[in-house]
Amino acid sequence: EIGYPPAMVMMARYLGQGKYMEKDSEGAWLLLIKTLKTKHDVARIQAALEFLPGGVGPENTKRAKSTLRGLINDGNSKAMVAYAMKVLKLKNAKPNTNESKEGIELLERAARKFQNPKAMIFLSLLYNQGNVVKRNEQKAIEYAQLAIDAKVPQAFGTMGQIYQNQGDNEKAIEWFKKGAAIDDGFSQGMLGFMFSGGFGVKQDLAKAVDWWRKARWNGDRMAASYLQVHRDKQKAQKAWKESQKEKLKKQ
């Protein structure tokens, strides 16, 4: 009612999805347009993304691109990251395409010139994986370290993953522990994974479950999946043991 842009975007999503209230696509569209006319850059980015396929606004990629491009030209690093990851879909881009080259350039600009922490993390992951850009462990470490220096909790887990991919599980554990100590859910979830398989540490399912629970509490979805798999295995084992007991009784 008071025209707070982030709240308008949230309300537009509720209206567009029919969540918590009656669906109103036109009302959602009007709120998004109103948000784009404000000076609240974060809300404008969020509103622009709703015009991409899958958003609550009527699909209008041109409008989304135009809004984000305008913000990029003004030096908005969040818009650079949004354009690279959402418009260019950098995670799924093929190597050496215009999309991958432009996306990497935007992320590097956001990371180096504007110290954007998300850009640092994405670049570290992309250089570590080598699917979109040629694998470069040195650059992966460099961007992870930049994120650590910028006090990004997830960066410790990102650094751990780099060493895990190199096969240096003991060093990976060191980094996961550093992230876990500051309650980074991703690092805690990865610690649980390492303990569950005995990678770089002595296998300890009790510790694995403990770390997964902490990670789930701190928002790590993968840890929640690991916990569910662990519970399913326990149920299956219990059911098998009981079936064996029943067989022995009948003999």
PLM region spans:
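Short helix-capping/linker turns of helical repeat alpha-solenoids
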Residues: E1-P5, Q17-K19, K37-R44, P53-G55, ...
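Terminal, low-structured helical/coil segments at or just beyond the last alpha-helical repeat
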Residues: R216-Q251
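TPR/TPR-like (Sel1-like) alpha-helical repeat modules
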Residues: Q203-R221
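Hydrophobic face of amphipathic alpha-helices that form TPR/SEL1-like repeat modules
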Residues: M10-Q17, A47-P53, M85-K91, F122-Q129, ...
